[in-house]
Amino acid sequence: MPGGLLLGDEAPNFEANTTVGRIRFHDFLGDSWGILFSHPRDFTPVCTTELGRAAKLAPEFAKRNVKLIALSIDSVEDHLAWSKDTNAYNCEEPTEKLPFPIIDDKNRDLAILLGMLDPAEKDEKGMPVTARVVFVFGPDKKLKLSILYPATTGRNFDEILRVVISLQLTAEKRVATPVDWKDGDSVMVLPTIPEEEAKKLFPKGVFTKELPSGKKYLRYTPQP
């Protein structure tokens, strides 16, 4: 598991300096979902492509009541200067403003607290840098998803958006999403729901795939 947080743990209510000023994390989240994601260093190629894609997708996350906040071991001043490069990469006006804040963790306090450091990747002083961690928190401030990539492999933010849509759907409805599921695809009825109850819960219908075992656990229904 990435770092010091396990699924179901409450997010630490830390304070930090960011590109939009000082924040307290729980106040920043409010009643929203939240994604806290770390990157190794500013002014590096893979990180620029990642935050560029996150910026492009920010409106899609916002539509779903999801707040983004990034973190690295660089200073606020570096974050702001690098934001110009990131916007230029996106063929946008090279301003210091991204659609989400970036946390200044130059002392590595949060990276240590949250277990975000990559021991295999070090800076010019021989100190470990932050790995590519993703934490998704629900409106209850509890961890719903964690992903850990090494510094050398960029993340897929379209996949992170897909997962968030699944998390929100399955938090509200008694369904699960199958392999390669996309928003709008059929979903799976939880195996703990009796057949008669499933018919009432899912008026659009329930399709059961016949299997050699004779067990009726592969049940699909249109996305509620």
Swiss-Prot record:
GO terms for cellular component: cytoplasm; cytosol; lysosome; mitochondrion
Q: Positions modified as Phosphothreonine?
A: 44, 177
Q: Where is the signal peptide?
A: none
All copies of domain Thioredoxin, residue ranges: 5-169
**PTM description:** Irreversibly inactivated by overoxidation of Cys-47 to sulfinic acid (Cys-SO(2)H) and sulfonic acid (Cys-SO(3)H) forms upon oxidative stress. Phosphorylation at Thr-177 by MAP kinases increases the phospholipase activity of the enzyme. The phosphorylated form exhibits a greater lysophosphatidylcholine acyltransferase activity compared to the non-phosphorylated form.
UniProt-listed Enzyme Commission number(s):
1.11.1.27, 3.1.1.4, 2.3.1.23
Reaction equations catalysed: a hydroperoxide + 2 glutathione = an alcohol + glutathione disulfide + H2O; a 1,2-diacyl-sn-glycero-3-phosphocholine + H2O = a 1-acyl-sn-glycero-3-phosphocholine + a fatty acid + H(+); a 1-acyl-sn-glycero-3-phosphocholine + an acyl-CoA = a 1,2-diacyl-sn-glycero-3-phosphocholine + CoA; 1-hexadecanoyl-sn-glycero-3-phosphocholine + hexadecanoyl-CoA = 1,2-dihexadecanoyl-sn-glycero-3-phosphocholine + CoA
Q: Where is this site: Important for phospholipase activity?
A: 32
- Where is the segment annotated Required and sufficient for targeting to lysosomes and lamellar bodies? 31-40
Classify the source by domain of life: Eukaryota
Single GO MF annotation = 1-acylglycerophosphocholine O-acyltransferase activity
**UniProt entry tagged with the keyword Hydrolase:** yes
Name a Pfam family for this protein.
Answer: AhpC-TSA
Which family does this protein fall into?
Belongs to the peroxiredoxin family. Prx6 subfamily.
Extra information: The active site is a conserved redox-active cysteine residue, the peroxidatic cysteine (C(P)), which makes the nucleophilic attack on the peroxide substrate. The peroxide oxidizes the C(P)-SH to cysteine sulfenic acid (C(P)-SOH), which then reacts with another cysteine residue, the resolving cysteine (C(R)), to form a disulfide bridge. The disulfide is subsequently reduced by an appropriate electron donor to complete the catalytic cycle. In this 1-Cys peroxiredoxin, no C(R) is present and C(P) instead forms a disulfide with a cysteine from another protein or with a small thiol molecule.
Tell me the function of this protein.
Answer: Thiol-specific peroxidase that catalyzes the reduction of hydrogen peroxide and organic hydroperoxides to water and alcohols, respectively. Can reduce H(2)O(2) and short chain organic, fatty acid, and phospholipid hydroperoxides. Also has phospholipase activity, and can therefore either reduce the oxidized sn-2 fatty acyl group of phospholipids (peroxidase activity) or hydrolyze the sn-2 ester bond of phospholipids (phospholipase activity). These activities are dependent on binding to phospholipids at acidic pH and to oxidized phospholipds at cytosolic pH.
Assembly and oligomerization: Homodimer. Interacts with GSTP1; mediates PRDX6 glutathionylation and regeneration. Interacts with APEX1. Interacts with STH. May interact with FAM168B. May interact with HTR2A.
Record's protein name:
Peroxiredoxin-6
Q: Which organism does this sequence originate in?
A: Macaca fascicularis (Crab-eating macaque)
